[in-house]
Amino acid sequence: NDGKSALYSQTDLELYRTGASPYTHPNVDWQDLLLRNSAPIQQYNLNFSGGGKVARYFVDLNVYNQDGFLKQDNSLNSYNTRENVKKYSLRTNTDIAITDHTQFKVNVFGQMYRETTPGKAIMGSIYRDMYTVPNNAYPVFNPNGTLGATPLYQSNNLYGQAVMSGYYLYPKTDFNIDATLEHYFQGALKGLYASATYSYNSSYREALNRSKGFETWSYWKDPTDPNAMEEYLQMASASSQSNATSYNRLNRMQYLEMAVGYDFNVKKNNFRTKILYAYNDFTASVKNIPLRKNSVGFRAEYDYDKRYLAEFAIAGMNLNTLKPGDQWGIFPSVGAGWNMHKESWFDVAVIDAMKLRASFGINGNDGTGAYYRSSSATLSDYYYTYLKYYKTGDNIYWG
């Protein structure tokens, strides 16, 4: 015994046991009050494919809906406060044989995603409090219908958090498309081929804040005196529903690649060459200056009877984030190899393949940061104000 007075008197314990005074001596089962027995998931999928010699296609449609466990009161709100996720997606793949030696391929993917949560944080507040707030902390409602509270739990009535705190809506969209055109020359130019690829990817993230505060009151009446006065004291005030929107991210990436190659052989001598140009344009958000990369490359490969191998490659890359005059980087490389298992004298039953190879090259790191002090812009309702400051004494080069 620490000599202190008991936290609960015998009268308190009896009132909790009998439930005779639920407003002054509550015993709330928070999980039963707030949670449903299940969280339904519905998913619908439709896909079909077809085509013939000239064209082939595949289409996939998907609808996904998942509800959360929280209960909601449709008589109080015209909107959903329960956690919910809806997703709609479409994917198509199409291959077209323009000629016997010319192929066109296009793939498209689009997705719309909408997540709803209560105005109070689910994991950081509602579900946490549901398992940590004592059952006798406060009544859900007072006798006059107001939300219950105490000086210790002033504004976090769990029912209010789940049902009366408004909601957040998180719309997300993704769109991707890539297309490739390939042609293989014939006749005197057999072995020569050309290809072009273009892709576009975008994603959009938004957060709509429709949360609001709710009013709570503490209540007291002597449970042992039927004629005692009721006492109410306001603990928290209601607030207007927010109408704020934040654009978390709107990024876009474009990629273009064009290549020409020529493969041929003379007896056991095999040659493969390829020239490539690529352009990459990435914008991280509506406020960011696009990051652009141009690259050109050449590669030549040779092998004799697939035994002796040699390769040479060189690439040049240009980044707009580097200092003017230092935006280009040149990166050569060479390599050689020997497939020993191709030799007539190599006869080892337990080894199917053995290869020796060596390579040397110079590479670069394009993740060294930007030469510009700021690669973003200030966004107002109607215009952009770009920041044009440069670093001084802190040049950035190819790393």
What are these regions, as identified by a protein language model?
Residues 5-26, 137-158, 216-229:
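A subset of solvent-exposed loop/turn segments in beta-rich extracellular surface proteins, enriched
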Residues 1-72, 243:
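Residues embedded in well-ordered regular secondary structure
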Residues 93-102, 107-112, 117, 121, ...:
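Extracellular/periplasmic, surface-exposed regions of secreted and cell-surface proteins
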Residues 1-23, 83, 100-116, 121:
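N-terminal, post-signal-peptide soluble/periplasmic segments
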Residues 38-40, 84-89, 173, 292:
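Short, glycine/acidic-rich beta->alpha junctions
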Residues 74-80:
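Short glycine-enriched, charge-decorated loop/helix-capping segments at active-site entrances
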